[in-house]
Amino acid sequence: MGNLSTPKSVQKLQTALHAKAKAEAGYRFYALYDKTSREDVLAHAYAQCRSNKGAPGVDGQEFADIEAYGVQRWLGELALALRQETYRPDPIRRVFIPKANGKLRPLGISTLRDRVCMTAAMLVLEPIFEADLPPEQYAYRPGRNAQQAVVDVEALLFSGHPEVVDADLADYFGSIPHAELLKSAARRIVDRRVLHLIKMWLECPVEETDDRGRKTRTTEARDNRRGIPQGSPISPLLANLYMRRFVLGWKMLGLERSLGTRIVTYADDLVILCRKGKAEEALHRLHEIMGKLKLTVNEEKTRICTVPSGEFDFLGYSVCCRRRKERRATANGVVKLHER
């Protein structure tokens, strides 16, 4: 979000929420909905969405349209809809983005109104759930990034974890079960109106346009009761919230100690670093736990790698570990770890 700074009033709110969550692990927040419609929160949410730019949703509305109408007027109407509980999200416009491997990745584009509302909710909820996320999770978190995740993977390889379960989850975002995700949210959030907002966003219809310009709408997320749309402002937070279940489950079962393992996750990218001779058992337990979470391990893409004889890719980095590494950018800008 560039140099966009958070207003002091919003910072104060976020600091108080985070401090309360950090101090009381069992505390459940009961009065949050009104905070999402606060003038300062909505204004900052709009500024964030504006700085991120992005294409219009199904209604075709662009930021220029809002500014011509009057931002304060537009935000005031959104705040009123939230307070009167008449707000309803629009369908999500689905587009397909080419991936490096030639396949297409679905991306959900919400309307600007919904993006601002989701961002406002994220501004309120993120400080609470951030207090609960374990250090093994690196994605979408303040002060953490992909390079830190790779650096820590490298450090673990050098500290006696030479076997790696390089895991791939089949359609993680599209597979997250709504009921279980909402249970994870309700562990901290009592405010039924906030939970209802999340539920509405999860169940949004999806609109696609074919090559002939014909539009079709589906309700697969609501019908299947699973999946969070990639591309929405609140999806990263929800994805982290559900992955937390796996990380905590692994620890609660004593697998970190008994198998000598360490986990590093970045969204749906996951590696389990193991003591020698423990990777096979770790892979078995991975399948077991993910099955209980109603997630699927992609067997074709999940493998065991032993360093220094092998290497694996993680977050656009090629990791190999025969000697100390140096980092350099390749021609396409992807940074890799190479042997010195």
For the regions a language model picked out, list residue spans one by one.
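Short alpha-helical scaffolding segments that buttress acidic/His motifs in well-ordered protein cores
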Residues: A45-C49, A120, L197-L202
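Non-catalytic, polymerase-adjacent accessory regions of viral genome-replication enzymes
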Residues: M1-Q72
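Conserved polymerase palm-domain catalytic core
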Residues: W74-E77, A81-F96, A100, D132-V307, ...
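Duplex nucleic acid-engaging cores and interfaces of nucleic-acid transaction enzymes
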Residues: L112-M122, A146, V150, E154
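Active-site and adjacent loop segments of nucleotide-processing enzymes
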Residues: Y317-R340
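Electropositive, glycine- and tryptophan-enriched low-complexity nucleic-acid-binding patches
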Residues: T119-Q137
